[in-house]
């Protein structure tokens, strides 16, 4: 793929200089459409309750679940509301899950004077064998028992369950199903290889020299400043770069200055200022050569709740001179040469990881596709805007490439849906710790990691042998 193209011209590296230098034109993007408008906030009113988003989520998802239930269990299955249940009568119920978790952090429990509890330390997982599932619809709620994986499911998931109500007031689940993958448009054929580079977690301002070296190597490769003619020819096939959040390091979050009185910090400079200047210079180099989409992340200077709004252009006075720089939302969706991309900076996957037994980030990505919702745990354990007319996190259309950023390691796989949908799942690793980015081939939907690691591992080996400084 990418490396094979570079190998075809590798012999030119040690060749004598020629009178004329080879030039490689950047592969143009035939069509591009930014489809992230549903994630743009027209108003910012936080006076509403979050019950509205759960209600509209259930209203939007119910037709998909009823249709899928009838396909799964037959058209004769009876779909009822919770208020219509009769003990012992088998039926199907569609509702929203609530997961009662004993280990889930609660600020009300921690500040309660009568409990006087010490705040529990952060955990990697908050699941417990005693967790229970409760199904809610518009009018009632009922506890679930039976053949359903309590540890895997999370609050906010809309699903259909088949079973019957029992005399003890619980619903005995015999089977359950999700809405599954949304409809998908076919990918138009491409005659040449074109690549989209996915990068996340640059972590600028963290103070790591190894990370800065890898970042500059990344920029030099993409802009054609590094390598022989073969590598430069391959770099010309990168039609777009997507930066998936956490452009700044978590070290730039100066909690100490936030907690201090303003008169004590009046003459101090925020730690993120230099990091933003550095980011502006990097974006300047990239956008001068290739279109760049910049998504915000957890540690970046924008709103914390999902959907995160684009970074303000005033922070990038150098890079915004180029029209190729595009500041976008998180989540972000776009169609590039007929291939529909949808991705996040990773907060939704990390939150599901904490409140579910699922361990693999690719498994969580696939699961969110199956339940047809980007972030079911929002707004329960992940902050989001209190929408009330529509839930923008529901998949209206199945993407061809679905990615999440800032994962511990790289991973990719292709899954298929019941209606011949084909989706490439990509876990984009945190660049500051792995020095790895991802290349997606738009023609074949193949994905490969590309590493920009310097001499960190070699230096550690030398020190282990007693040869290092």
UniProtKB/Swiss-Prot annotation:
GO molecular function per UniProt: DNA binding
Chief localisation class: nucleus
InterPro entries: DNA_pol_a/d/e_bsu, DNA_pol_D_N, DNA_pol_delta/II_ssu, PolD2_C
Protein family: Belongs to the DNA polymerase delta/II small subunit family.
Gene: Pold2
Quaternary structure, from the entry: Component of both the DNA polymerase delta and DNA polymerase zeta complexes. Component of the tetrameric DNA polymerase delta complex (Pol-delta4), which consists of POLD1/p125, POLD2/p50, POLD3/p66/p68 and POLD4/p12, with POLD1 bearing DNA polymerase and 3' to 5' proofreading exonuclease activities. Within Pol-delta4, directly interacts with POLD1, POLD3 and POLD4. Following stress caused by DNA damaging agents or by replication stress, POLD4 is degraded and Pol-delta4 is converted into a trimeric form of the complex (Pol-delta3), which consists of POLD1, POLD2 and POLD3.
Protein name, entry field: DNA polymerase delta subunit 2
Record's GO cellular component terms: delta DNA polymerase complex; nucleoplasm; zeta DNA polymerase complex
Family matches, as PANTHER family: DNA POLYMERASE DELTA SUBUNIT 2
Top-level taxon in the UniProt lineage: Eukaryota
Protein function: Accessory component of both the DNA polymerase delta complex and the DNA polymerase zeta complex. As a component of the trimeric and tetrameric DNA polymerase delta complexes (Pol-delta3 and Pol-delta4, respectively), plays a role in high fidelity genome replication, including in lagging strand synthesis, and repair. Pol-delta3 and Pol-delta4 are characterized by the absence or the presence of POLD4. They exhibit differences in catalytic activity. Most notably, Pol-delta3 shows higher proofreading activity than Pol-delta4.
Record carries keyword Acetylation: yes
GO term, biological process aspect, one: DNA-templated DNA replication
Disulfide cysteine pairs (residue numbers): none
Keywords (A to Z) from UniProt: Acetylation, DNA damage, DNA excision, DNA repair, DNA replication, Nucleus, Phosphoprotein
Subcellular location: Nucleus
Modified residues (Phosphoserine): 257
Residues where N-acetylmethionine is found: 1
